[in-house]
Each structure stands twice: as C-alpha cells, then as structure tokens.
C-alpha cells in the first residue's frame, strides 16, 4: 500500500513538518497577465532575500463565489499561458486549484501542484484524477471535516499511486459566517504522514459574511500564523495583494504585499525556535 511521503519536493522547494518553513503565496485569483507578473516578481524578490522556498499560487477560476455576479478569473487557457511564462521568468513552481476531473489533465503539463478546494475535498473522482497526473496534490481540509477525517481523503490519493500529497488546514465552521482554527488539528493531521500547511488567510474568512461576498478579518492573520508556527507546520499558504480592499475576491482576508516581508521574517524566526526544541 502506498502511503503519504513525509517529505514532498516541489521543484526546489521542500515541504516537511521537520524542515524549515516553505511558502505558498500569491493573489487569490489571476486577474491579468501584468498583475500576475507584478505580484510574482515582488514575491520572488522577497523570498529570495529571506531564503524561504516559494510556490506561487493563483486561481484561474473562482468557481465557488458567493454571488453569480462576482468576478471569477481569467480562465484556464489564458492562465496556463501565464503560469508557463512565470515559471520561465522566475524559476519557481506554481500551484492552482482544479474543480473537475477534466481540468486535471489540462493543468498538469504546466502546473506543479494541483490543489483540491476545501468544498471538494471528498469528491473521490476528482481526487483520483488529480493523483493520477503524478503531480503533487494539495488538499484543503473541508470546513466541515474533523482533522482525523483527512485520513480517508489522503488515502484516496495515495492508494491511487501518488504519495506526494500535502494537507492544508484552513479553519472549521463555527456557527454562521464564522471559521475558527483549532491548533490541535495540525499535529493530528501531521500524524497522518503528510506535510501540513496552514492557510493563514482563508482561516480568517467570514464566509458569505458581506451578503453578496465573503468577509474576513485580516488583522488576525498574523495571530493565527504565529500560533500555527509555534505548534509546527511544513509551510504556510498566504494570499496577498498590493491593494486587498479593491481586489476582485477575498480582499478582506488577504495580506497587503508590502506587509509580507515583516510577517515572513517573524514566522521564520518562530519556526527556527519551534523546530530546534
């Protein structure tokens, strides 16, 4: 039986619960080619300076927007062209989320990490299709799942022949329009064998909290991230934007990109202490 690898390599980036922190970061959705290059360039520069491995993320389609009228992204075909060019320009691996089995085969030749959205984390056919591409699969734990329930989710991928899987904690539903982060989930999920990622920005979401869109409390991103790094994680998932208040999606919980270097410095310092104990 194939089991999850405790160390997962994505290009030159290593994810392991006992290795130095790695980062998955980028804007919520891919807005334009120029915007993608602006964000990628700034993230590449800061992560090179800080010495932290970067996987650049962005979504070609936000398929689960609160409102039918909400912006969803530039689409699969255009996004794949941009991802390919970003990889050539900056040399980092890239991640995007997929929503159907058919998208897996289309995305895999370009994208290094296929991400399973939290709402879809139990969709067996989608998990199998993602696994069979041979790419690293990052599964967001559903807001409705207990951390130990991820055992069966991860098994659907590993038993399809792919041991390279990441498990991401992004909060659990707590009443209406509210998520909470139970830090016990991190060691529980680590006990399942896969590297654990903490999604510090979606964890402060207020789903549907603005009526026609999702709200958030970005002022608590650092609070939760510091707690998570003290417990111990393989990496962080952080969405960022140069002007979150005017971003087309998830603005209320994205970190302003000019605040990212200071945040990462703190998290890396705490990570060194936590993993030295």
From Swiss-Prot:
Keyword list, A-Z: Cytoplasm, Lipopolysaccharide biosynthesis, Transferase
Protein name, entry field: 2-dehydro-3-deoxyphosphooctonate aldolase
Enzyme class, first EC level, given as a word: transferase
Record-stated family: Belongs to the KdsA family.
CC annotations in GO: cytoplasm
Pfam family, one: DAHP_synth_1
Entry's Gene Ontology BP terms: keto-3-deoxy-D-manno-octulosonic acid biosynthetic process
Compartments reported by the entry: Cytoplasm
Entry GO MF terms: 3-deoxy-8-phosphooctulonate synthase activity
The species this protein was found in: Brucella abortus (strain 2308)
Disulphide bonds in the chain: none
UniProt keyword Lipoprotein present: no
Reaction(s) this enzyme catalyzes, per UniProt: D-arabinose 5-phosphate + phosphoenolpyruvate + H2O = 3-deoxy-alpha-D-manno-2-octulosonate-8-phosphate + phosphate
Enzyme Commission designation: 2.5.1.55
Pathway: Carbohydrate biosynthesis; 3-deoxy-D-manno-octulosonate biosynthesis; 3-deoxy-D-manno-octulosonate from D-ribulose 5-phosphate: step 2/3; Bacterial outer membrane biogenesis; lipopolysaccharide biosynthesis
InterPro entries in UniProt: Aldolase_TIM, DAHP1/KDSA, KDO8P_synthase
